[in-house]
Amino acid sequence: MFVAIGSNSDHGERGLENETDRARIWLVDIASGRHRPYATGLRNPVGMAFGPGPAPVLWTAVNERDELGSDLVPDYMTSLRDDGFYGWPWSYYGQHIDTRVAPPNPEAVARAIAPDYALGPHTASLGLAIGAPSGLPAPFAAGAFIGQHGSWNRRPPSGYKVVFVPFAGTRPSGPPQDVLSGFLDEEGRARGRPVGVALDGRGGLLVADDLGDTVWRVRSA
């Protein structure tokens, strides 16, 4: 079983001693209770899903850090390597150093893996589902669906929608496409905030909205 645990802070500002065993995905043996870190340096990994292909790889959607401006840092979706390190808190999106973090750790930065796919800054990309739903039209035939909870500190706002990232084979192959939007009114006030996403057994896409207290089901008319 894979278990995602987010950080206790934005960039370690509460003390790195308070981040022990956090900002990582654990691999847990349910029968014995034994566990070990599977992937580390992930500020807030939320959604997880296995990608397509004969040897499925685990992917996650990661909610990255704030307070570096409206256009940094992009949230992202990435495949995971066993024992891979993805930078947090010392660097972001690979080896871009966050100078706010003390003490620095150049050795950790040097081994930080750049993620596979940027999902935009402050989108709060949380939910993740990967598959080929039969109930959606051809443009959404195979790829990843991401629930974007939406920004709280960006102008203009970002996120507040569900996007689709097409895959070719086992890899992302194009720009994100909106699947479900309209969660902001004309004055920029939220009337819904997508979180979890899942593919149901009848070919539809389920979207949990924790502001509207609603689960939406999306499929072709």
Locate each region found by the language model.
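Beta-propeller domain segments
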Residues: 7-13, 20-31, 43-44, 49-180, ...
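Small/polar loops that bind or transfer phosphate-bearing groups
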Residues: 40, 207
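C-terminal amphipathic alpha-helical "assembly" element
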Residues: 197, 204-205, 215-221
